[in-house]
Every structure is written in structure tokens, then in C-alpha cells.
């Protein structure tokens, strides 16, 4: 068992919410599910959900400039051959102004959370201006 598995926890309720998020039926709409690490308990807990996004930039507008977050994103896009694809990826939001103790907590939790949430692609952002449709499209293709 890795040290991260002993250090961090995630409740069954939160895992069910992540599964529900992953299995949404409406794949043509962008959604974001925001999670945070409770500093005291080291539990990963929900911090909000943004539904029916018009653009990924709306996610950036919701983020704090001092608090890191894990954001699961269901992102409808067209493949090079024109088919609709809805990849699930994670934005690892770690703003430059984050206190060092929080930076270390989130850095330690990142790979563990990526594994338990079964997300294979991670887009790292330190500035809200990094989260753009162009940057995400380039990242996913």
C-alpha cells in the first residue's frame, strides 16, 4: 500500500458522486465537478459542480487564486474524423499564490486521487488564463 493511500481518504458518498459524474447520459454538454482536500482530515471532498458549461473558461472563472483544486471535466469535442467524443480529464489547479503547506498536500494527493477517480489525463494549470478552450483542445488531441 502506498503512503498516499494511508494519508488520504475519500468517502463512499464522494466516490458515488464521481461515478455518477462519469456516467452522465448527456454527453454533448460540458460539466465540471470540483473537489478539494480537507486540510485537517486529508479527505477529498466535493466543493461544487458546474453544469451545462458553455466554455471551459467558465471553470477558470470559478476558481480561487489561492486554493488548489482537483476539477473533473466532461468535455465534448469533435475528433479529427468528425465524431463526437466526450473525454473525461482532470484539471489540477495549483495557483501560484497557494501557501506552501497546501501545495504539498495537493501534490501528494494528485496521483492517488487520479488513480481512485480513474482519470488518465491531467491538465495542470497555475493561472486562470491557462484554462482556455484552445489549450484544452491541444492537450486532448
UniProtKB/Swiss-Prot annotation:
Keyword 4Fe-4S, does the record have it? Answer: no
Q: Which InterPro entries match?
A: ADF-H, ADF-H/Gelsolin-like_dom_sf, GMF
Q: Which GO terms describe its biological process?
A: actin filament debranching; negative regulation of Arp2/3 complex-mediated actin nucleation
Disulphides: none
Q: Which residues cross the membrane?
A: none
State one molecular function term (GO). Answer: Arp2/3 complex binding
Classify the main location. Answer: cytoplasm
Compartment(s) where it occurs, according to its Swiss-Prot or TrEMBL record: Cytoplasm; Nucleus; Cytoplasm, Cytoskeleton, Actin patch
Is Zinc among this UniProt entry's keywords?
no
What cellular component terms from Gene Ontology apply here? Answer: actin cortical patch; cortical actin cytoskeleton; cytosol; nucleus
Highest taxon in the source lineage: Eukaryota
Q: Which residues form the ADF-H domain?
A: 6-141
Matching SUPFAM superfamilies: Actin depolymerizing proteins
Query: Which residues, by range, are in coiled-coil regions?
Result: none
Keywords on this record?
Answer: Cytoplasm, Cytoskeleton, Nucleus
Gene3D superfamilies with a match to the protein in the record: Severin
Its biological purpose: Actin depolymerizing factor involved in the control of the disassembly of actin patches. Binds and suppresses the arp2/3 complex functions such as the promotion of actin polymerisation and branching filaments.
Family assignment?
Answer: Belongs to the actin-binding proteins ADF family. GMF subfamily.
What do we know about how this protein assembles, alone or with others? Associates with the arp2/3 complex.
Supply the name of the protein. Actin-depolymerizing factor gmf1
- Organism of origin: Schizosaccharomyces pombe (strain 972 / ATCC 24843)
Amino acid at each position: 500500500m502506498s503512503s498516499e493511500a494511508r494519508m488520504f481518504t475519500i468517502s463512499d458518498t464522494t466516490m458515488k458522486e464521481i461515478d455518477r459524474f462519469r456516467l452522465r447520459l448527456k454527453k454533448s454538454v460540458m460539466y465540471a465537478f470540483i473537489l478539494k482536500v480537507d486540510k485537517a482530515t486529508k479527505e477529498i471532498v466535493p466543493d461544487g459542480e458546474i453544469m451545462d458549461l458553455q466554455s471551459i473558461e467558465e471553470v477558470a472563472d470559478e476558481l480561487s487564486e489561492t486554493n488548489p483544486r482537483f476539477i473533473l471535466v466532461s468535455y465534448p469535442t469533435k475528433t479529427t474524423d468528425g465524431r463526437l467524443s466526450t473525454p473525461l480529464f482532470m484539471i489540477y489547479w495549483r495557483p501560484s499564490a497557494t501557501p506552501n503547506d497546501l501545495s504539498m498536500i495537493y501534490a501528494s494527493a494528485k496521483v492517488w486521487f487520479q488513480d481512485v477517480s480513474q482519470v488518465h489525463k491531467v491538465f495542470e494549470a497555475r493561472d486562470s488564463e491557462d484554462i482556455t478552450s484552445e489549450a484544452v483542445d491541444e492537450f486532448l488531441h
